[in-house]
Amino acid sequence: MKRARIIYNPTSGREIFKKHLAQVLQKFEQAGYETSTHATTCAGDATHAAKEAALREFDLIIAAGGDGTINEVVNGLAPLDNRPTLGVIPVGTTNDFARALGIPREDILKAADTVINGVARPIDIGQVNGQYFINIAGGGRLTELTYDVPSKLKTMLGQLAYYLKGMEMLPSLRPTEVEIEYDGKLFQGEIMLFLVTLTNSVGGFEKLAPDSSLNDGMFDLMILKKANLAEFIRVATMALRGEHINDQHIIYTKANRVKVNVSEKMQLNLDGEYGGMLPGEFVNLYRHIHVVMPKEKAEQLDD
């Protein structure tokens, strides 16, 4: 019998997963999985639980939570030689990674069905400073809002909490001097932010990295150069439509490796969570983890 381990964050997404847990377990049992669960209790717990489950040779590990929970599970699996297949049940606020995979984000039971009936494909992940990420890494004051927003506010307001925090931060945004090397090229200058992405879905923007691929061995690198408040707002508005990539303030390109040096303190954002401080070198790990996705999405990757 196949064995599945569900690692879930009991506080994610208005604490809704706990209410559906019995039904989710029933679905997996009916699909032929011997299924057990682990409820996370603190930061880093999902990483430890994922590593432990992998060493116990579970066939499938399901991360049920937000992008931060998925990131922790990936960090438990990525360093191992034998990595179980990863399934995702999105229960967070933004759910960027699930959006990129085409996994239902509004219905936990439909997401569970996708994990059961979907297809596993190997996808790229990123590594920087000994840590792993599966969706996005970045730096710049605005990228910090994803972990500056209190958990209780996210639980109450959902995505709106991020918009409110972003509006609050806008007047205080200022550029930072950086040096960014990417595949033999060099950018030196002041930036508002930079993003190293693996999917097209970033911070709820579905077209921020429109050329991204889950399995091409390349990051999408986006650099927003120094801009005043009006220019910044204009670029952000264009980003909703994916039209920002041709703007004069934007560098948008593909890269397998990205090295960032900073002249002043800059925090590192990994999948929406605090990832320490820069500098850092971002390395793309080609098709490193098998992830379950809808059959239609898998067919797109196969083309």
Swiss-Prot record:
Protein name listed in UniProt: Diacylglycerol kinase
Keyword Acetylation found: no
Active site: 273 (proton acceptor)
Enzyme class, spelled out: transferase
Cofactor binding annotation: Binds 1 Mg(2+) ion per subunit. This ion appears to have a structural role and is required for catalytic activity.
Gene that specifies this protein: dagK
GO BP term (any one): phospholipid biosynthetic process
Pfam (any one): DAGK_cat
Phenotype seen when the gene is deleted: Cells lacking this gene are not viable. They exhibit accumulation of diacylglycerol, disappearance of phosphatidylglycerol, and the cessation of lipoteichoic acid formation.
Family membership: Belongs to the diacylglycerol/lipid kinase family.
Annotated GO MF terms: ATP binding; ATP-dependent diacylglycerol kinase activity; metal ion binding
Species name: Bacillus subtilis (strain 168)
DAGKc domain mapped to chain residues: 1-132
